[in-house]
């Protein structure tokens, strides 16, 4: 698999290098030179496979020249060794596709665990690796869990202080060992900026073996393609004809993966890019002006991102496939409407959380006659226990993954969003 840097097309690397580097020169994201496709006959065969076999088949379309299918199967099985997604009926024409049945109760488990397996496989010389990543909530826990206790790997996670839920924080800031966490006095965009500055410091990058586990890393992105095929396999032939998928969007990695599944050959009619008040992309799609505003805090905190990294990949994909960007559906939802939507879902017999509620709301409002809709459930409601209980006035029991960590002390450090402070921390052995 060859990939090129979106900021410098002359910089081309293979899959192994892209996984290890994370970012290219000038902080550019890597994108596939070739966009593989599957025929309708191949698709029919793939949809009949079990999740692990199908995922191996899909991923091999991208990376078979570097990793054998047998080797890939082994690592996919290890990465996805948890309960697979569930489809839950909400109304006749709208179902929720739950992606939060992994060890950290969020869809990020798919990408983070596959990336950890790829680092394990590709680090043939057992070199020391430092994984630096920023999180707006769920990435931190997924990455920490995926790399916890892994030899020669140090993980450093940045997150905005006071802007993720208490239970999200408990999942990754109580581990210790090779997992280091730093709360930043600022927004997620400040955290992301610090990560990019670290990658721009060539000397630092080389001295500590710097890598990133955000959705900017191509291995995470490719892994997420797999569950879109799973979703398609779980619905009827009739429902497949006019399928619309609503995706809660923060850094837009989840939507990028969905669009890559469509590029590969999955016949999805349309996607809805769903945001909260941090609506840079909906405004851009509406008026053609890219104008990020200051990030605002919302009850759907994992989507509190005003400068999404993966948007450049989406634009590149639309350009390469000659798709019309105007056909991408979009919308943003306020906190008040999110709360009302959570109540609506509860009346329908479904306990959800703010991020999925936003996707449901926009799907419900935009779904046309004869269309069938899926909205992605990206995190377990218990991760937002206080918020959801306050809105629904209904108690939520904690899964064991959260119950086991709730009383553990936080081990986080705290710094201002100043690169020199982070650099000092990174250089400490």
From Swiss-Prot:
The modification N6-(pyridoxal phosphate)lysine is found at residue 108. Its cofactor is pyridoxal 5'-phosphate. InterPro entries: Ser/Thr_deHydtase_PyrdxlP-BS, Thr_synth_N, Thr_synth_N_sf, Thr_synthase-like, Threonine_Synthase, TrpB-like_PALP, TrpB-like_PALP_sf. Transmembrane segments: none annotated. Pathway: Amino-acid biosynthesis; L-threonine biosynthesis; L-threonine from L-aspartate: step 5/5. Its EC number is 4.2.3.1. Keywords: Amino-acid biosynthesis, Lyase, Pyridoxal phosphate, Threonine biosynthesis. SUPFAM superfamilies: Tryptophan synthase beta subunit-like PLP-dependent enzymes. GO terms for biological process: threonine biosynthetic process. Signal peptide: none annotated. The keyword Amino-acid biosynthesis applies. PANTHER family: THREONINE SYNTHASE FAMILY MEMBER (PTHR42690), THREONINE SYNTHASE-LIKE 2 (PTHR42690:SF1). Belongs to the threonine synthase family. This is Threonine synthase.
């Amino acid at each position: 698999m060859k990939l090129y840097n979106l900021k410098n097309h002359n910089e081309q690397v293979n899959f192994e290098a892209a996984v290890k580097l994370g970012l290219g020169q000038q902080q550019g994201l890597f994108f596939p030179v070739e966009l593989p496709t599957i025929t309708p006959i191949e698709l029919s065969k793939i949809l009949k496979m079990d999740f692990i076999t199908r995922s191996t088949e899909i991923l091999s379309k991208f990376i078979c020249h570097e990793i054998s299918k047998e080797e890939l199967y082994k690592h996919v099985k290890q990465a996805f060794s948890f309960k697979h997604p569930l489809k839950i009926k909400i109304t006749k024409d709208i179902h929720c596709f739950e992606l939060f049945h992994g060890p950290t109760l969020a869809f990020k488990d798919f990408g983070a665990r596959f990336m950890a397996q790829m680092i394990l496989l590709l680090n043939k010389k057992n070199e020391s690796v430092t994984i630096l990543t920023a999180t707006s909530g769920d990435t931190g826990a997924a990455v920490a869990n995926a790399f916890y206790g892994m030899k020669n790997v140090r993980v450093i996670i940045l997150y905005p202080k006071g802007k993720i839920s208490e239970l999200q924080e408990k999942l990754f800031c109580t581990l210790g060992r090779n997992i280091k966490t730093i709360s930043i006095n600022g927004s997620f965009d400040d955290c992301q900026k610090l990560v990019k500055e670290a990658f721009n410091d060539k000397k630092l990058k080389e001295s500590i073996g710097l890598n990133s586990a955000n959705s900017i890393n191509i291995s995470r992105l490719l892994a997420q393609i797999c569950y879109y095929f799973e979703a398609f396999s779980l619905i009827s032939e009739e429902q497949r004809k006019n399928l619309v998928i609503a995706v809660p969007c923060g850094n837009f990695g989840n939507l990028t993966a969905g669009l890559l599944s469509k590029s590969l050959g999955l016949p999805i009619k349309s996607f809805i890019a769903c945001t909260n008040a941090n609506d840079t992309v909906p405004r851009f799609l509406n008026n053609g002006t890219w104008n990020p505003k200051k990030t605002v805090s919302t009850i759907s905190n994992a989507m509190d991102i005003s400068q999404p990294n993966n948007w450049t990949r989406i634009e590149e994909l639309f350009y390469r496939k000659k798709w019309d960007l105007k056909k991408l559906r979009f919308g943003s939802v306020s906190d008040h409407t999110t709360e009302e939507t959570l109540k609506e879902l509860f009346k329908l017999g479904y306990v959800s959380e703010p991020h999925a509620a936003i996707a449901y709301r926009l799907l419900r409002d935009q779904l046309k006659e004869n269309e069938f809709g899926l909205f992605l459930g990206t995190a377990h409601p218990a991760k937002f226990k206080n918020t959801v209980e306050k809105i629904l006035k209904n108690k939520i029991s904690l899964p064991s993954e959260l119950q086991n960590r709730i009383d553990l002390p936080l081990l986080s450090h705290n710094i201002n969003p100043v690169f020199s402070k982070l650099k000092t921390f990174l250089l400490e052995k």
